[in-house]
Amino acid sequence: MPDDRKEKTSEADARAVAEFIHGAFYSPQARARNTPARIEFSRLTQRRYRESVADLLSGFAETRQTERSGGLQAEYFQSKGMNKKDKSALQRIDPIVRFDFGTNSPTPDITADQFSIAWSGSVLAPESGEYQFRVTTPNGARLYVNTDLAAGDSNRRDDSDAKREVALVDLWVSSGGVERQGSGALYLLGGRSYPLRLDYFKFKEKTAAVRLEWKPPHGPWTGIPSSVLSPDGSSATPIIGTSFPAEDSSLGYERGHSISKEWWRTITRAGTETSELVAERLPRLAGLPADLTNRTELSRRMQDFCAQLAERAFRRPLDTELRHRTVDLWFQPGVALEDSVKRSVLAVM
């Protein structure tokens, strides 16, 4: 009421009006009623996304994890020309790979002019991030990390035409005994073991030496400590290498609370990379026999695999509509089966 007409209202009326206004606009119930809860999207952080892809694909193949630490399994060979591993002379566990043999042989049972050493086992990544690996030698060496090795990767003969995988570091062709360094980088998920193999040889050079180092996330170059090396083998883990946008850590921890155009572009690239990983490993992941050539049967098995992958990714059985959108839609006559699998995986991701 106007100040000059106060007599027109009573204290009871004023109280009733105030209670009504407070209840209608300012009380907790009113604020909740007048400001409905907003639906917000959330997403996986980049670390959780990579872990989800790794777990999803690893679930389709037999996996091995290490049980011991203390170094790598080493086997020393006498070489003979093209045959780098003509005769095994010594097997032992080497805590680290940092040797300077000079003009001597590593063991009395092999000659100093030509020999080879194979170190194999696993390396444990203490944290998630990009790891760099470096090999230093005046001789020849190849380093493989987190790779499913092919027959040719035993590096027994230089004239072998067996299939090889691309080495992370390849210094196989020496340069007149001059010391060289080679390095490579890859993203590893923390808390997991990854297969590691280093093949090294000397052939007629004056001296022999080899050193294996790494640069973990947030750390300097250093020798790989024996505490993270194991003589046991482990299974390669499929890890996507797509670069993700920075996460929001304003609350003290990473959280995925915003879905931007940049994020959509990133997960599209990540989904494409995941489909490539699946295609590379398809026979093993889908359990396809090497002698199976019938297209109808291959298509059926691949569709079953894609449906199983989708169910695991969505954590629920597929209904008819969802199976059509993620699997059946992509397997059409005239389309290569591998391309159909890639499109199905991309749709799921």
Language model segments and positions:
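Glycine- and acidic
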Residues: 2-3, 34-35, 117-122, 177-182, ...
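Residue-level detector of secondary-structure boundary/capping sites
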Residues: 8, 12, 40-45, 68-72, ...
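A generic secondary-structure signal for well-formed alpha-helical elements
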Residues: 21-29, 48, 56-64, 127, ...
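Primarily short, surface-exposed interaction patches in extracytoplasmic proteins
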Residues: 190, 291, 295-349
